[in-house]
């Protein structure tokens, strides 16, 4: 049974109903409708922490989706799952792929920055000051771009940039 038919969460049910109405009203191909259904089910599974199921749905959506912009969001969500699982190298791959298709995705830029910042913190713990500085500089570059695209977001990053002299 498709996930859309077994949602227990009110927000997921509402999203599913609205999405189904839009799919019926908007002129889209069967392939696009199927891709969106998989994407929607992936988002639902992801919101419930069912990451394996979410990935299966996202991979199927990727197989069907041809629009680069829409694919960017699928790739971004796959990156989120890998981040949640602590698979930062894989997450970075998906965030970069998302940005290749949609350079105006500040959340992907922010998540890349967060990973580089985390790696910088790890380098400090290992006594690798030079490496940590390079990683923090990389994080700063990505945060600056994210902030340029979404100036009212990422307040903590803005403060960190100012406090570290990287603004």
Swiss-Prot record:
Residue spans of the TPR repeats: 35-68, 72-105, 120-153
Membrane topology label: Peripheral membrane protein
Subcellular location: Plastid, Chloroplast thylakoid membrane
Superkingdom of source: Eukaryota
Signal sequence bounds: none
Keyword check for Lyase: no
Matching SUPFAM superfamilies: TPR-like (SSF48452)
Keyword Thylakoid set for record: yes
Pfam family, one: TPR_1
Keywords in alphabetical order: Chloroplast, Membrane, Photosynthesis, Plastid, Repeat, Thylakoid, TPR repeat
GO CC, one annotated term: chloroplast thylakoid membrane
Protein's GO biological process: photosynthesis
Similarity remark: Belongs to the Ycf3 family.
General function of this protein: Essential for the assembly of the photosystem I (PSI) complex. May act as a chaperone-like factor to guide the assembly of the PSI subunits.
Protein name in UniProt: Photosystem I assembly protein Ycf3
Natural source organism: Stigeoclonium helveticum (Green alga)
């Amino acid at each position: 049974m498709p996930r859309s038919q077994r949602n227990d969460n009110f927000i997921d049910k509402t999203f599913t109903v609205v999405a189904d109405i839009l799919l019926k009203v908007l002129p889209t191909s069967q392939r696009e409708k199927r891709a969106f259904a998989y994407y929607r089910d992936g988002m639902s599974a992801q919101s419930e922490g069912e990451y394996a199921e979410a990935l299966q749905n996202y991979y199927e959506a990727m197989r069907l989706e041809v629009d680069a912009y829409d694919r960017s969001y699928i790739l971004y969500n796959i990156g989120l799952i890998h981040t949640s699982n602590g698979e930062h190298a894989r997450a970075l791959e998906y965030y970069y792929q998302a940005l290749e298709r949609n350079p105006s995705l500040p959340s992907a830029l922010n998540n890349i920055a967060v990973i580089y910042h985390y790696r910088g913190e790890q380098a400090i713990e290992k006594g690798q000051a030079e490496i940590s500085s390079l990683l923090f500089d990389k994080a700063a570059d990505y945060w600056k771009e994210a902030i340029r695209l979404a100036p009212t977001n990422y307040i903590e990053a803005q403060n960190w940039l100012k406090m570290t002299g990287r603004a």
